[in-house]
């Protein structure tokens, strides 16, 4: 990324450091009055704001069932989707969410944009701001890119982090919380297991911060030693290096894919060997609570981290996560658009 002020490079060590101590000091996503102006990370968000987002999403779920699937909340506003990394579910659901809020949505073709010709990220943002953008939805391979944009964009512009490097994916974390609340109601009595490549997963980071904020008494991280970051125990997370032990009696299972594109070297054996030790099969699912739900942020790698019988089975709520994601992203966009310094 070519910027006058560079976002930090990712590494296993820097990912662990951010996991333990946060990305930036302070909370630049809140207004002086403590309202949500940007959504950059779940870390540091007050519980009241998290619950407000989930409660607002409740109001938007029914929009999907209407004959006219629109509300006028963002009418006249321009939302720019800036996806510097490939995405299917996240970009599409953000586009649907903004459209259902009656916003004008523009998807920047990164490969054909001036950033591919050497223009800095901040120059690109300044030019788009001059076109009277009201909101930037940003996905970037560099951790911190959305923070950088939020610090330098025009005062009226709102920034939503759609995933930055290994750091955070706050709307995925929020839609995961919405899904859990929909099926389990009470966070304060749950055991939640996050399984797989947690070291490289921005979703895991956002989920852990959200779960602890909402009062989940037991969060488990399950995976090979090479794929677990340091600092988990200091966050109150129980660490397991054996899948069978970690799944015992859990109420929610969040499976993660291997983030091969973020790995700097060969950390694991073959996909078949990984599935043998860490894949969620019907037999392993039976170790969890009888009414446990299975979640996955996608994309899934069947036969690697999850068996098709589980992914398509009655305890899977994976497709519901996608559906709920639209309402949650509508809620986030609607809330931030109404808050200014």
From Swiss-Prot:
Q: Name one Pfam family in it.
A: OTCace
What keywords are assigned to this protein? Pyrimidine biosynthesis, Transferase
One Gene Ontology cellular component annotation held by this UniProt entry: cytosol
- Gene3D superfamilies per the UniProt record, alphabetical: Aspartate/ornithine carbamoyltransferase
Q: Which GO terms describe its molecular function?
A: amino acid binding; aspartate carbamoyltransferase activity
Any one biological process term the GO annotation gives: 'de novo' pyrimidine nucleobase biosynthetic process
- PROSITE patterns given in the database record: CARBAMOYLTRANSFERASE
Named in its record, the pathway it takes part in is: Pyrimidine metabolism; UMP biosynthesis via de novo pathway; (S)-dihydroorotate from bicarbonate: step 2/3
Binding of L-aspartate, residues: 117, 202, 257
Protein's UniProt keywords contain Magnesium: no
NCBIfam families assigned to the protein according to its UniProt record, in alphabetical order: asp_carb_tr, PRK00856.1
Record function comment: Catalyzes the condensation of carbamoyl phosphate and aspartate to form carbamoyl aspartate and inorganic phosphate, the committed step in the de novo pyrimidine nucleotide biosynthesis pathway.
Q: Which family does it belong to?
A: Belongs to the aspartate/ornithine carbamoyltransferase superfamily. ATCase family.
Q: How does it assemble?
A: Heterododecamer (2C3:3R2) of six catalytic PyrB chains organized as two trimers (C3), and six regulatory PyrI chains organized as three dimers (R2).
The protein's name is Aspartate carbamoyltransferase catalytic subunit
